[in-house]
Amino acid sequence: MSDILAKIEAYKREEIAAAKRACPLAELEARARDASPPRGFVAAIRNKHANGDYALIAEVKKASPSKGLIRADFDPPVLARAYQAGGAACLSVLTDTPSFQGHLEFMVAARSATTLPVLRKDFLFDTYQVAEARAHGADCILIIMAALDDAAAADIEAAALDSGMDVLIEIHDRDELDRALKLRSPMIGINNRNLRTFETTLATSEALAPLVPKERLLVGESGIFTPADLTRLARVDIQTFLVGESLMRQADVTAATRALLARDASPASAAE
């Protein structure tokens, strides 16, 4: 685990302990059972593919550790509706506060504003966070293989699947891919950002995608800015893309989303 992830785990463990004191697991699980049913994250992506379209997981992100504040006029419901109007298949909402200025209530607000399935984008280290995600309406959770050992990843995945949610398993090297393939979830996200240096290159996806069995559902993450980037990744059978920063910086998010997904556009890549 990188030093960055170790620091994140330290504050996350403190957050989890405080949350457990405020709301015991049994109470949280009861809330999760009463929450709005999962909308089907993987199903929404496959529906886009069945229609011959790319599938976009559009991210609602206010800030990041590497870039600082990304969008000052940050309004999750407005952004969520803009993404849906632009053709997104799903939403991803940052809920981590210390590093991303996110919040669980941002996810609740974004989901309530649309009919799209929503990913809770956060660093999960405990199955308590899975129940927390479902209680707040999440349809999918994220497992970051760089942050977890195999046993913890399997426990978190099982808790999510048992609750009816989908799981996006994130990897960024061959070792993490081999470990991810031992899990049950079909979605494998290849993060083009090096979690140690924060540098991004689409070459990461190009190297790892051919190693993933065809029955898995590949997602390209980070470093994706233009239709040319989507075309480049599609050459290695990646048809689903998680994009946040490049869209969040646009004045007209709906128009930017439509432009990104336009297959006939081919401006030079801005990702490298």
From Swiss-Prot:
One of its GO terms (molecular function) is phosphoribosylanthranilate isomerase activity. Its EC number is 4.1.1.48. The keyword Transport does not apply. SUPFAM superfamilies: Ribulose-phoshate binding barrel. Keywords: Amino-acid biosynthesis, Aromatic amino acid biosynthesis, Decarboxylase, Lyase, Tryptophan biosynthesis. It holds the Pfam family IGPS. One of its GO terms (biological process) is L-tryptophan biosynthetic process. It catalyses: 1-(2-carboxyphenylamino)-1-deoxy-D-ribulose 5-phosphate + H(+) = (1S,2R)-1-C-(indol-3-yl)glycerol 3-phosphate + CO2 + H2O. InterPro entries: Aldolase_TIM (IPR013785), Indole-3-glycerol_P_synth (IPR045186), Indole-3-glycerol_P_synth_dom (IPR013798), Indole-3-GlycerolPSynthase_CS (IPR001468), RibuloseP-bd_barrel (IPR011060). The keyword Lyase applies. It comes from the Bacteria. Pathway: Amino-acid biosynthesis; L-tryptophan biosynthesis; L-tryptophan from chorismate: step 4/5. HAMAP family: IGPS_B (MF_00134_B). PANTHER family: INDOLE-3-GLYCEROL-PHOSPHATE SYNTHASE, TRYPTOPHAN BIOSYNTHESIS PROTEIN. Belongs to the TrpC family. This is Indole-3-glycerol phosphate synthase.
